[in-house]
Amino acid sequence: MARKKIALIGGGQIGGVLAQLCALRELGDVVLFDIVEGLPQGKCLDIAEASPVDGFDVCLKGTNSYEDIAGADVVIVTAGLPRKPGMSRDDLIEVNSKIMTSVAEGIKQYAPNSFVIVISNPLDAMVTLCQKVTGFPYNRVIGQAGVLDSARFATFIAWELGVSVKDVTAMTLGGHGDDMVPLVRYASVKGIPVMELLERKYGSKEKAKEVMDAMVNRTRLAGGEVVALLKTGSAFYSPASSAIAMAESILKDQKRVLPTCAYLQGEFGVNGYYVGVPCVLGEKGIENIIEFSLDAEEQAMMDKSVAAVKSLVDSLK
Protein backbone atom coordinates (compact mmCIF):
# COMPACT_ATOMS: atom_id res chain seq x y z
CA MET A 1 0.00 0.00 0.00
CA ALA A 2 1.37 3.38 -1.01
CA ARG A 3 2.31 5.76 1.76
CA LYS A 4 0.28 8.89 2.29
CA LYS A 5 1.71 12.16 1.01
CA ILE A 6 1.58 15.48 2.82
CA ALA A 7 2.44 18.73 1.05
CA LEU A 8 3.42 21.74 3.14
CA ILE A 9 3.21 25.13 1.43
CA GLY A 10 5.53 27.62 3.11
CA GLY A 11 8.95 26.72 4.46
CA GLY A 12 9.06 29.20 7.32
CA GLN A 13 8.89 28.51 11.03
CA ILE A 14 5.55 26.69 10.97
CA GLY A 15 6.40 24.79 7.80
CA GLY A 16 9.63 23.47 9.27
CA VAL A 17 7.94 22.26 12.46
CA LEU A 18 5.13 20.69 10.41
CA ALA A 19 7.67 18.74 8.35
CA GLN A 20 9.38 17.50 11.50
CA LEU A 21 6.10 16.47 13.15
CA CYS A 22 4.93 14.66 10.01
CA ALA A 23 8.20 12.74 9.96
CA LEU A 24 8.26 11.95 13.68
CA ARG A 25 4.69 10.60 13.52
CA GLU A 26 5.32 8.89 10.17
CA LEU A 27 2.11 10.33 8.76
CA GLY A 28 3.48 9.92 5.26
CA ASP A 29 6.04 11.24 2.83
CA VAL A 30 6.59 14.99 3.05
CA VAL A 31 7.03 17.67 0.40
CA LEU A 32 7.98 21.10 1.73
CA PHE A 33 7.46 23.92 -0.78
CA ASP A 34 8.78 27.47 -0.62
CA ILE A 35 9.62 30.13 -3.20
CA VAL A 36 13.03 30.75 -1.57
CA GLU A 37 15.60 28.50 -3.20
CA GLY A 38 17.47 26.28 -0.76
CA LEU A 39 15.23 26.95 2.25
CA PRO A 40 12.88 23.95 1.99
CA GLN A 41 15.68 21.74 0.67
CA GLY A 42 17.89 22.61 3.63
CA LYS A 43 15.17 22.05 6.21
CA CYS A 44 14.19 18.69 4.73
CA LEU A 45 17.81 17.56 4.60
CA ASP A 46 18.29 18.60 8.22
CA ILE A 47 15.17 16.69 9.36
CA ALA A 48 16.08 13.62 7.28
CA GLU A 49 19.51 13.46 8.89
CA ALA A 50 17.78 13.11 12.27
CA SER A 51 15.90 9.99 11.12
CA PRO A 52 18.47 7.45 12.38
CA VAL A 53 18.37 9.12 15.79
CA ASP A 54 14.59 9.56 16.05
CA GLY A 55 13.77 6.32 14.27
CA PHE A 56 11.39 7.52 11.58
CA ASP A 57 11.35 6.30 8.00
CA VAL A 58 9.71 8.70 5.55
CA CYS A 59 10.81 10.52 2.43
CA LEU A 60 11.32 14.29 2.80
CA LYS A 61 11.65 16.52 -0.25
CA GLY A 62 12.21 20.27 -0.32
CA THR A 63 11.16 22.02 -3.49
CA ASN A 64 10.52 25.33 -5.25
CA SER A 65 8.14 23.77 -7.77
CA TYR A 66 4.43 23.13 -7.29
CA GLU A 67 4.76 20.12 -9.58
CA ASP A 68 6.26 18.19 -6.67
CA ILE A 69 3.05 18.38 -4.62
CA ALA A 70 1.27 16.20 -7.20
CA GLY A 71 -0.62 13.35 -5.59
CA ALA A 72 -0.70 14.90 -2.12
CA ASP A 73 -3.45 13.57 0.13
CA VAL A 74 -3.33 16.59 2.44
CA VAL A 75 -1.94 20.06 1.78
CA ILE A 76 -1.24 22.37 4.73
CA VAL A 77 -0.83 26.03 3.82
CA THR A 78 1.30 28.28 6.02
CA ALA A 79 2.56 30.65 3.31
CA GLY A 80 2.29 34.35 4.07
CA LEU A 81 3.88 37.06 6.14
CA PRO A 82 3.78 36.57 9.93
CA ARG A 83 2.64 39.20 12.37
CA LYS A 84 5.03 41.69 13.88
CA PRO A 85 4.55 43.41 17.26
CA GLY A 86 1.63 45.83 17.19
CA MET A 87 -0.01 44.18 14.17
CA SER A 88 -3.35 42.43 14.20
CA ARG A 89 -3.98 39.35 12.08
CA ASP A 90 -6.25 41.48 9.92
CA ASP A 91 -3.39 43.86 9.03
CA LEU A 92 -1.92 41.10 6.86
CA ILE A 93 -4.89 40.73 4.54
CA GLU A 94 -3.69 42.64 1.47
CA VAL A 95 -0.26 41.05 1.05
CA ASN A 96 -1.30 37.57 2.14
CA SER A 97 -4.31 37.57 -0.20
CA LYS A 98 -1.95 37.79 -3.16
CA ILE A 99 0.18 34.97 -1.77
CA MET A 100 -2.86 32.78 -1.05
CA THR A 101 -4.25 33.26 -4.56
CA SER A 102 -0.98 32.02 -6.06
CA VAL A 103 -0.80 29.09 -3.63
CA ALA A 104 -4.40 28.04 -4.27
CA GLU A 105 -3.81 28.08 -8.03
CA GLY A 106 -0.83 25.76 -7.54
CA ILE A 107 -2.87 23.38 -5.38
CA LYS A 108 -5.76 23.38 -7.86
CA GLN A 109 -3.44 22.48 -10.73
CA TYR A 110 -1.22 19.88 -9.11
CA ALA A 111 -3.17 18.42 -6.15
CA PRO A 112 -6.82 18.58 -7.27
CA ASN A 113 -7.93 15.69 -5.06
CA SER A 114 -6.29 16.87 -1.85
CA PHE A 115 -7.71 18.05 1.45
CA VAL A 116 -6.48 21.54 2.30
CA ILE A 117 -5.81 22.90 5.79
CA VAL A 118 -5.10 26.63 5.90
CA ILE A 119 -3.10 28.21 8.73
CA SER A 120 -2.16 31.53 7.08
CA ASN A 121 -3.54 34.71 8.67
CA PRO A 122 -5.95 36.40 8.67
CA LEU A 123 -7.29 32.84 8.82
CA ASP A 124 -11.00 33.35 8.19
CA ALA A 125 -10.32 35.38 5.04
CA MET A 126 -7.48 33.18 3.78
CA VAL A 127 -9.44 29.91 3.99
CA THR A 128 -12.35 31.60 2.21
CA LEU A 129 -10.04 32.78 -0.58
CA CYS A 130 -8.37 29.37 -0.87
CA GLN A 131 -11.71 27.61 -1.34
CA LYS A 132 -12.87 30.20 -3.85
CA VAL A 133 -9.74 29.94 -6.00
CA THR A 134 -9.44 26.13 -5.87
CA GLY A 135 -13.16 25.56 -6.28
CA PHE A 136 -12.80 22.49 -4.05
CA PRO A 137 -15.86 21.25 -2.10
CA TYR A 138 -16.28 22.98 1.26
CA ASN A 139 -15.63 19.76 3.20
CA ARG A 140 -12.14 19.59 1.67
CA VAL A 141 -10.96 23.14 2.47
CA ILE A 142 -10.77 23.98 6.15
CA GLY A 143 -8.93 26.33 8.46
CA GLN A 144 -6.85 25.72 11.57
CA ALA A 145 -7.59 28.12 14.39
CA GLY A 146 -9.97 26.58 16.90
CA VAL A 147 -7.70 23.68 17.83
CA LEU A 148 -4.98 26.18 18.72
CA ASP A 149 -7.26 28.67 20.47
CA SER A 150 -8.87 25.85 22.46
CA ALA A 151 -5.46 24.45 23.38
CA ARG A 152 -4.37 27.84 24.67
CA PHE A 153 -7.56 28.14 26.74
CA ALA A 154 -7.01 24.63 28.15
CA THR A 155 -3.38 25.43 28.96
CA PHE A 156 -4.30 28.49 31.01
CA ILE A 157 -7.00 26.53 32.87
CA ALA A 158 -4.57 23.71 33.69
CA TRP A 159 -1.99 26.18 35.01
CA GLU A 160 -4.58 27.98 37.13
CA LEU A 161 -5.93 24.78 38.70
CA GLY A 162 -2.64 22.90 38.93
CA VAL A 163 -3.86 19.92 36.91
CA SER A 164 -2.65 18.05 33.84
CA VAL A 165 -3.58 19.60 30.51
CA LYS A 166 -4.60 16.07 29.46
CA ASP A 167 -7.58 16.24 31.80
CA VAL A 168 -8.85 19.66 30.69
CA THR A 169 -11.54 20.00 28.04
CA ALA A 170 -12.00 23.48 26.61
CA MET A 171 -13.26 24.89 23.34
CA THR A 172 -13.52 28.16 21.45
CA LEU A 173 -15.95 29.13 18.72
CA GLY A 174 -16.08 31.91 16.15
CA GLY A 175 -13.38 33.72 14.25
CA HIS A 176 -9.64 33.54 14.81
CA GLY A 177 -9.32 37.02 16.25
CA ASP A 178 -9.85 39.13 19.32
CA ASP A 179 -13.60 38.40 19.21
CA MET A 180 -13.25 34.61 19.44
CA VAL A 181 -15.61 32.88 21.89
CA PRO A 182 -14.00 30.73 24.61
CA LEU A 183 -16.89 28.65 25.97
CA VAL A 184 -16.66 28.97 29.74
CA ARG A 185 -19.81 26.94 30.43
CA TYR A 186 -18.45 23.88 28.63
CA ALA A 187 -14.91 23.99 30.08
CA SER A 188 -14.25 21.08 32.43
CA VAL A 189 -11.64 18.99 34.22
CA LYS A 190 -12.52 15.29 33.92
CA GLY A 191 -16.12 16.35 33.42
CA ILE A 192 -16.19 18.71 36.41
CA PRO A 193 -17.10 22.28 35.40
CA VAL A 194 -14.10 24.59 35.65
CA MET A 195 -16.21 27.35 37.21
CA GLU A 196 -17.17 25.04 40.06
CA LEU A 197 -13.51 24.22 40.69
CA LEU A 198 -12.60 27.91 40.64
CA GLU A 199 -15.39 28.72 43.09
CA ARG A 200 -14.10 26.03 45.46
CA LYS A 201 -10.55 27.30 45.10
CA TYR A 202 -11.37 30.96 45.75
CA GLY A 203 -14.48 30.64 47.92
CA SER A 204 -16.63 33.03 45.90
CA LYS A 205 -18.38 33.21 42.56
CA GLU A 206 -17.18 36.77 42.05
CA LYS A 207 -13.49 35.87 42.36
CA ALA A 208 -13.97 32.76 40.22
CA LYS A 209 -15.54 34.88 37.48
CA GLU A 210 -12.73 37.42 37.72
CA VAL A 211 -10.10 34.69 37.29
CA MET A 212 -12.01 33.09 34.41
CA ASP A 213 -12.49 36.44 32.67
CA ALA A 214 -8.73 36.96 32.83
CA MET A 215 -8.12 33.53 31.24
CA VAL A 216 -10.68 34.23 28.52
CA ASN A 217 -9.02 37.54 27.74
CA ARG A 218 -5.56 35.97 27.70
CA THR A 219 -6.84 33.30 25.31
CA ARG A 220 -8.16 35.95 22.93
CA LEU A 221 -4.86 37.81 22.99
CA ALA A 222 -2.57 34.77 23.26
CA GLY A 223 -1.20 35.02 19.73
CA GLY A 224 -0.24 38.64 20.28
CA GLU A 225 1.42 37.72 23.57
CA VAL A 226 3.76 35.36 21.72
CA VAL A 227 4.38 37.94 18.97
CA ALA A 228 5.32 40.58 21.56
CA LEU A 229 7.79 38.23 23.23
CA LEU A 230 9.40 36.92 20.03
CA LYS A 231 9.56 40.38 18.40
CA THR A 232 10.55 38.83 15.05
CA GLY A 233 7.52 36.71 14.16
CA SER A 234 4.54 34.80 15.48
CA ALA A 235 3.80 31.45 17.13
CA PHE A 236 4.88 28.34 15.25
CA TYR A 237 5.14 25.31 17.54
CA SER A 238 1.52 25.29 18.72
CA PRO A 239 -0.06 26.17 15.34
CA ALA A 240 1.91 23.35 13.72
CA SER A 241 0.84 20.82 16.37
CA SER A 242 -2.77 21.92 15.95
CA ALA A 243 -2.73 21.49 12.17
CA ILE A 244 -1.10 18.07 12.51
CA ALA A 245 -3.94 16.93 14.80
CA MET A 246 -6.39 17.86 12.05
CA ALA A 247 -4.34 16.26 9.27
CA GLU A 248 -3.87 13.05 11.25
CA SER A 249 -7.61 12.77 11.92
CA ILE A 250 -8.27 13.02 8.17
CA LEU A 251 -5.42 10.75 7.04
CA LYS A 252 -6.23 8.04 9.59
CA ASP A 253 -10.02 8.53 9.51
CA GLN A 254 -9.98 9.07 13.27
CA LYS A 255 -13.25 11.04 13.29
CA ARG A 256 -11.99 13.33 16.03
CA VAL A 257 -14.21 16.20 17.10
CA LEU A 258 -12.03 19.26 16.60
CA PRO A 259 -12.85 22.98 16.49
CA THR A 260 -12.46 23.75 12.80
CA CYS A 261 -12.85 26.82 10.62
CA ALA A 262 -15.64 25.39 8.45
CA TYR A 263 -18.00 26.76 5.82
CA LEU A 264 -21.43 27.12 7.42
CA GLN A 265 -24.69 26.73 5.55
CA GLY A 266 -27.20 27.57 8.25
CA GLU A 267 -25.45 25.97 11.21
CA PHE A 268 -25.35 28.21 14.29
CA GLY A 269 -27.49 30.65 12.31
CA VAL A 270 -24.62 31.47 9.93
CA ASN A 271 -24.90 31.10 6.18
CA GLY A 272 -22.13 31.45 3.61
CA TYR A 273 -19.08 32.10 5.79
CA TYR A 274 -16.16 30.16 7.26
CA VAL A 275 -16.43 30.21 11.06
CA GLY A 276 -14.87 28.15 13.85
CA VAL A 277 -17.18 25.35 15.07
CA PRO A 278 -16.73 21.76 16.30
CA CYS A 279 -16.49 19.27 13.42
CA VAL A 280 -15.96 15.56 12.93
CA LEU A 281 -12.83 15.17 10.78
CA GLY A 282 -12.33 11.91 8.90
CA GLU A 283 -11.44 10.48 5.52
CA LYS A 284 -14.00 12.74 3.82
CA GLY A 285 -12.64 15.87 5.50
CA ILE A 286 -15.47 17.54 7.39
CA GLU A 287 -17.94 14.69 7.90
CA ASN A 288 -20.25 16.44 10.33
CA ILE A 289 -20.67 19.87 11.88
CA ILE A 290 -21.77 19.51 15.49
CA GLU A 291 -24.39 22.03 16.57
CA PHE A 292 -25.40 22.63 20.17
CA SER A 293 -27.26 25.23 22.19
CA LEU A 294 -25.74 28.55 23.19
CA ASP A 295 -27.14 30.66 26.00
CA ALA A 296 -27.94 34.34 25.47
CA GLU A 297 -24.49 35.58 26.51
CA GLU A 298 -22.66 33.00 24.37
CA GLN A 299 -24.90 33.76 21.39
CA ALA A 300 -24.22 37.48 21.72
CA MET A 301 -20.46 36.82 21.71
CA MET A 302 -20.83 34.45 18.75
CA ASP A 303 -22.83 37.06 16.83
CA LYS A 304 -20.12 39.66 17.48
CA SER A 305 -17.39 37.25 16.37
CA VAL A 306 -19.27 36.29 13.21
CA ALA A 307 -19.85 39.98 12.41
CA ALA A 308 -16.08 40.55 12.61
CA VAL A 309 -15.50 37.58 10.29
CA LYS A 310 -18.06 38.88 7.79
CA SER A 311 -16.49 42.34 7.79
CA LEU A 312 -13.05 40.87 7.16
CA VAL A 313 -14.14 38.42 4.46
CA ASP A 314 -16.36 40.96 2.70
CA SER A 315 -13.32 43.24 2.35
CA LEU A 316 -11.93 40.63 -0.06
CA LYS A 317 -14.86 40.98 -2.44
From Swiss-Prot:
This is Malate dehydrogenase. It comes from Geobacter sulfurreducens (strain ATCC 51573 / DSM 12127 / PCA). Belongs to the LDH/MDH superfamily. MDH type 3 family. Substrate binds at R83, R89, N121, R152. It is an enzyme of class 1 (oxidoreductase). One of its GO terms (biological process) is tricarboxylic acid cycle. The active site is at H176 (proton acceptor). Pfam families: Ldh_1_C (PF02866), Ldh_1_N (PF00056).
